[in-house]
């Protein structure tokens, strides 16, 4: 028996069967999807949104994100190093980034499920890609992936280290 899906999920509205939206309704739909991406990721930019197959084009999302920024709902800037282009973030994400930046580096090892949307190993972070299998976890230390495997295997390797 397969386990339940892991991670954060949200239902998307289907497009109208008529296929015709007013410009304002379409802008509102794209803004809703931009907010959904911001809720999921905290910080969004072109490379990270390329993972999302059901989102509109980057051009449409970028325009929506600029509107949200102009209304003061989100902030634009450079939040994640190593990526070109504009980035947008929620105020909560910015506060979290500042808190991490201002705190001393931790020796704590963190485990996340490979099926979690946070699994960006080999996608936008260095190293090999870890497939999103429900039985696989990834060990991180100081934001760097150390190794991955079944939970028991990873815990065993951590105890030996």
Locate the predicted segments by residue.
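Long, charged, low-complexity, helical-prone intrinsically disordered regions
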Residues: 1-161
């Amino acid at each position: 028996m397969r386990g339940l899906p892991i991670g954060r999920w949200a239902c998307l509205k289907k497009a109208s069967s008529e296929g015709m939206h007013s410009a304002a309704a379409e802008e509102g739909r794209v803004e809703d999807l931009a907010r959904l991406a911001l809720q999921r990721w905290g910080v969004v930019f072109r490379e990270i949104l390329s993972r999302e197959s059901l989102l509109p084009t980057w051009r449409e999302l970028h325009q929506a994100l600029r509107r949200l920024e102009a209304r003061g709902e989100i902030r634009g800037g450079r939040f994640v190093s190593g990526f070109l282009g504009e980035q947008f973030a929620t105020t909560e994400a910015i506060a979290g980034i500042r808190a991490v930046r201002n705190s001393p580096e931790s020796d704590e090892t963190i485990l996340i499920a490979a099926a979690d949307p946070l699994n960006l190993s080999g996608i936008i972070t260095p190293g090999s890609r870890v497939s999103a299998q429900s039985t696989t976890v990834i060990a991180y230390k100081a934001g760097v992936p150390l190794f991955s495997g079944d939970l028991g295997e990873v815990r065993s390797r951590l105890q030996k280290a």
